[in-house]
Amino acid sequence: MSQGKVVPEELATLERLCQTVGIETGIAARIANGLRDAIVGTSAAAPLKPNSVAQLTWLGVDDASVQALQPYVMLLWVAGTPVPTPVNVNTASAEVLTAAIKGMDPATAEHLVQLRQRTPFKTLADFTNQIPALAPVSAKLDVRSSYFEVRGRLRLVDRVLIERSLLQRQPSGQSVVLQRERIASLEQVSG
């Protein structure tokens, strides 16, 4: 999404991710168009802006597709607008690498994941040297991250508090909490 318009390259990446995780590729257009309408829509019919992947159901995405996408995507908003962020090749799953790099096959992506477990890529050039047939790769890749999701869980007898926080690493190196979500629940106590 850029200036209220769907970016074809980003839509193609989301379509590849949908295909990789085994859901209909048309879901990608539904998500992209729904997000666009939520951002620029001014009518009462405009959808609410989802703040989490689970809320993609607001855009007409079925629960099974949301569950399939949940481990691989995050909606990132700052001041009400989407923030495009590069994919960190040192932390991305094989599925995300397959989607992010046009022409990448799952076996090559899995091989790259295994390589980086031994030695993380220090530069993007180190990464692209491993896949010369696919170079040049998108500028939407990097070897570091600026945004992180941190999850915590505290259990006290039959109560559980789960907290998810979205952090941004500032250029100074300091981390700032952008979002925090707390969920309290009761657990079944086996006895």
Where are these regions (language model features)?
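Compositionally biased linear targeting/interaction segments
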Residues: 1-191
